[in-house]
Amino acid sequence: MEKKTLSLCPICLKRIPATILEEDGKIIIKKTCPEHGEFKDIYWGDAELYKKFDKYEFIGKIEVTNTKVKNGCPYDCGLCPNHKSTTILANIDVTNRCNLNCPICFANANKSGKVYEPSFEDIKRMMENLRKEIPPTPAIQFAGGEPTVRSDLPELIKLARDMGFLHVQLATNGIKLKNINYLKKLKEAGLSTIYLQFDGISEKPYLVARGKNLLPIKQKVIENCKKVGFDSVVLVPTLVRGVNDNEVGGIIRYAAENVDVVRGINFQPVSFTGRVDEKTLLEGRITIPDFIKLVEEQTDGEITEEDFYPVPSVAPISVLVEKLTNDRKPTLSSHQHCGTSTYVFVDEDGKLIPITRFIDVEGFLEIVKEKIEEIGKSKMHDVKVLGEIALKLPSLIDLDKAPKSVNIKKIIDLILSVLKSDYSALAELHYHMLMISCMHFMDAYNFDVKRVMRCCIHYATPDDRIIPFCTYNTLHRQEVEEKFSIPLEEWKRMHKIGGEDDREDY
């Protein structure tokens, strides 16, 4: 197996040809920069799983672009006509200020000496740009820096809701959420989900990555969410070899113990920046198959490789909903090697039961594809299509293996409601399960233009661009932040901030 693509030189960031090939049971990316020499990285830690995920490839399409093709991908973001996926989740960095000073971070205002903080009106315009997409961007995440250091965050959340975003998410370290009244204020403003930085269940990951033990704060946030009835938290561990890769199972168990408020976990393997020697890179790289193996080992086989699917495996469901409603829908058309997930139910005794153990997922996806073809050929009425699916669904469920706590009829009803384009049913369906996922964002070493073109997680910027996640962080972030930043000392004078090290304010 050998594929040709384009990548980046990790040193000069120039676009260079690359080859993706199988080597010793793994998928490797190799490339040569005329100036800086050869580079080799692990693209995918298991060749067989790579091939299995390949069959779920789904090419999307976009109708609205903001930039023209001039220099070619990944320099023309965006979105440019080369892109293949509309925005599913948009990030807006509302500030680069932070109330932490993490050893591994070099991008916050304290380290850079500059403050990037778009105004309320800037952010409103960025959100308007996102809603102009076809279909309009459904979900938005306020990020940073640490977004909770902005005093107008509740107003931004309310504005997003008023503008029609179905899902408003907050990426946070959780420090300010230990204040229960502040949490209540965010909930009242319309916050949907807390995307909580959560590096592990022991002190070590926090001491290494954050410089202090933040675990008690994370636990306090979960406790506060229970008190105020905020029941949508996603734990977000940055996965680092030798730091917290031994805590994957423990994090999953912790989420299961708090499944009344924790909706899921999204593991993110660490990215590499700067000059990294090949030995360090190959030994430290965690790919999606590596993550899956860690899950299987550390859950004692309760969750296995067979339970995980690539993100675009569900894209045909969106296509069917589009055909039934005659309306464009957001489609998870990311590259098949960008992310993976599974859903598990937590039984009464705490046992983890993946949905694949009692529902024939492949069978359901086949039915969906069949109905898409039938609608295309015969213009079947939506009621008839849904009726036929409803008749077939029970045969895909093994009641003997289903968790006792699960109301199967309710699950079937919710699935049918989702096919009718009922977003509230989709949200309720998630409340019955725990999502376990992994998104492997790229860096300059494993960068693949073909993956970037299919990205559906984007950044909105003050210059009316919408930029894929991995190109923003690898290429465009510095340019955008420099263009729209002011010196830290000037910002402090403008806001009458004093003191040398006021972590609560910057």
Swiss-Prot record:
Alphabetical keyword list = 4Fe-4S, Iron, Iron-sulfur, Metal-binding, Methyltransferase, S-adenosyl-L-methionine, Transferase
What's noted on cofactor binding? Binds 2 [4Fe-4S] clusters. The clusters are coordinated with 3 cysteines and an exchangeable S-adenosyl-L-methionine.
SUPFAM superfamilies per UniProt: Radical SAM enzymes
Q: What is its EC number?
A: 2.1.1.-
**Recorded GO terms, molecular function?**
4 iron, 4 sulfur cluster binding; metal ion binding; methyltransferase activity
Q: Which residues of this UniProt protein bind [4Fe-4S] cluster 1?
A: 73, 77, 80
Give the matching Pfam families: Fer4_12, Radical_SAM, Zn_ribbon_HMPTM
Domain Radical SAM core: residue ranges: 82-300
Cofactor names from the entry are: [4Fe-4S] cluster; S-adenosyl-L-methionine
Family affiliation:
Belongs to the radical SAM superfamily.
**What functional role does this protein have?**
Catalyzes methylation of 7,8-dihydro-6-hydroxymethylpterin, likely using methylenetetrahydromethanopterin as a methyl group donor, via a radical-based mechanism.
Name of protein: 7,8-dihydro-6-hydroxymethylpterin dimethyltransferase
Starting at the broadest rank, the lineage of the source organism is: Archaea, Methanobacteriati, Methanobacteriota, Methanomada group, Methanococci
